[in-house]
């Protein structure tokens, strides 16, 4: 279709993954109606015929809203529950963006959940995989209400559970990484964090509580067998200052994510290789 702003295909739904995919595709088409001046959108919908009309209610479908820096009104950050910033694989951070995220966290008592590909080394960095991966115990700190998601593909298998997420990215694309995307902010990340920050805020309660829990669990780690995790445990405190660490995917990255790197050390990983093997 050469006149449509967006063309999507919605297949038959056989499971929850199909349902999630169709929800994203339908939202993508409807949002195209008003994006960059708007225009027609095309939905190619698969259907089958049934004479069963017994269904009286259909499941709720979530609308996804796109915002730009030119909007006169911005949605408010919910006050009912914790707020986290989740950073996937990210380009090198500027001091300006780091300061903007720090100010946002200080305003909303938020933490920044990172893995070693995130690149953020600011005041609110949390490497909480050890808390989030527990199966026989669940910390009340491992659940939040809102996730602000920036960055791309992540090697972090264990992350905090959130009720809904807002995606911030200049391309404005719908990337439902956590299955609960509600809003997309089509703008530079620094613009978003600056807008929602307040001057002279200094909240750190959530950050301090989560770090205290991480330290308690680290103290309980038993003697590990010779493994990738054992090597990470032994080497993380012996890395040269101002070095750059390059991880292989996926086991090495996942193992080292249990241990926070010393300040001044950056890590990289070619997460673009996920799925090729």
Which residues make up each language-model segment?
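Structural signature of the thiamine diphosphate
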Residues: 8-60, 138-165
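Glycine-rich, anion-gripping cofactor-binding loops and their flanking helix/strand elements
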Residues: 87-166, 262-277
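Phosphate/pyrophosphate-binding active-site segments
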Residues: 162-253
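Glycine-rich phosphate/diphosphate-binding loops that line cofactor/substrate pockets in enzymes
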Residues: 30-37, 73-83, 104, 235-241
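Acidic-glycine-rich active-site phosphate/pyrophosphate-binding loop
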Residues: 246-266
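A short, well-structured juxtamembrane/interface segment
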Residues: 68-77, 95-98, 138, 223-238, ...
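Short acidic-hydrophobic, aromatic-tinged amphipathic segments that line or gate anion-handling sites
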Residues: 6-13, 127-135, 182-197
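Glycine-rich beta-alpha junction loops
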Residues: 45-51, 89-91, 117-118, 172, ...
């Amino acid at each position: 279709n050469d006149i449509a702003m967006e063309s999507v295909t919605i297949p038959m739904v056989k499971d929850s993954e199909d349902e999630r995919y169709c929800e994203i595709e339908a939202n993508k088409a409807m949002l195209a109606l008003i994006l960059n001046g708007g225009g027609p959108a095309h939905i190619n919908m698969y259907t089958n015929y049934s004479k069963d009309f017994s269904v009286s209610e259909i499941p709720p479908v979530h609308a996804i809203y796109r915002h730009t820096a030119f909007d006169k009104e911005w949605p408010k950050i919910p006050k009912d529950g914790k707020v986290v910033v989740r950073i996937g694989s990210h380009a090198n951070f500027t001091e300006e963006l780091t300061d903007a995220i720090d100010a946002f966290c200080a305003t909303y008592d938020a933490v920044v959940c990172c893995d070693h590909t995130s690149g953020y080394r600011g005041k609110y960095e949390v490497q909480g995989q050890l808390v989030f991966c527990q199966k026989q115990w669940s910390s009340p700190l491992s659940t939040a209400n809102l996730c602000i998601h920036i960055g791309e593909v992540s090697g972090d298998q264990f992350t905090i559970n959130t009720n809904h997420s807002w995606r911030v990215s200049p391309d404005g694309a719908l990337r439902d990484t956590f299955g609960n995307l509600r809003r997309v902010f089509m703008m530079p990340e620094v613009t978003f964090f600056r807008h929602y920050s307040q001057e002279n805020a200094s909240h750190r309660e959530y950050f301090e509580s989560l770090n205290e829990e991480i330290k308690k669990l680290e103290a309980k780690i038993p003697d590990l067998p010779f493994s990738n995790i054992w090597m990470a445990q032994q080497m993380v405190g012996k890395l040269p200052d101002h070095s750059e660490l390059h991880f292989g995917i996926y086991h090495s990255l996942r193992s080292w994510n249990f241990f926070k790197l010393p300040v001044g050390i950056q890590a990289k990983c070619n997460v673009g290789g996920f799925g090729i093997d």
